[in-house]
Amino acid sequence: MSTTGTAFAQTQAPDARLTRVANLAGQHKPAGVPQDYVQTPFGYFAPACVRHIGASERILADGTLQKANGIQEQSARCSQDNFTSNGVRVRPNGLGLDGQEVRRGASSAAFKKRSPVPAAIDHAYISSAGYYSGVSPGRIVANWKVPPNPTNVARQTIYFFPALQSDTPVILQPVLGYRGESNSWDLSSWNCCKEGVVWYSDFIPAKSGDQINGDVYATCAAGSVCSSWNIDTRNVTSGRSVRLSTTSYGDLTQIMAGALEGYSVDSCDEYPASGNITFTGVAVYDYRMKQVRSPPWEEIIDNSGLDLQCNYQLDTTSTTATIHY
């Protein structure tokens, strides 16, 4: 039988791989973001709100962290605002200063309406292939290869991932990250942003040419809409993998075959030298675990607010998404 512990505060600093705002070049520091905030795939968050979840642990529906031994620890609430990649302030409840949802915003609306994304979306996705599903999903799985390192190694951070996202908004994603400070790649699993908290798994290394598999799937029996999910990120080449087990906190009806996200990119040669990445074997399943044979992928490119204009393009088939940069 599990035992519930007392509330705990975040006592361990977020992983050192995650860049602090204080360490960003001046031109990449959004105005108003505190110096101690951490850069994540979802924007900038207070260190106390960026939390690690270990192997065999699980985030429960009420935000409790269930440890591998069954002990449950009630996590401290995140009371600090966070910021999108371009500095839009977001309350822990996901609302902006105008009282409107921020991260759901125009991207979700565009998928639903099958229309272009308006300018100035408040997230860091530069390119994404996705669609809005009227049926609750049960799984998305995709494969991709780690691209060559950039020829211009600076302090850029670049993320690639498939994902499932809700209107809550919560996003579950297996992530490949490149970090210019170390000129290296890593893999991890993420869940954001219920009540302003970002959860991340252990990190495992990757290198150019490695084959990667990302798998986000419900753990309930097929045929029921499920709130219990695993996010598995595997380096098929090395045989290593990480898992984040979590509650979904909403219906994950925004499906993404692949996305590109970037921070502190000053020139096009700071992207991987291949110029593109292809997500292959992309398969979407509904809550009955019936495969969606022809997902209606929408190709969304939001580079309108970027000073740097590279070769941003998207190509999709029923089972692939190629992102050009």
Predicted regions and their residues:
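C-terminal segment of classical bacterial N-terminal signal peptides
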Residues: 2-6
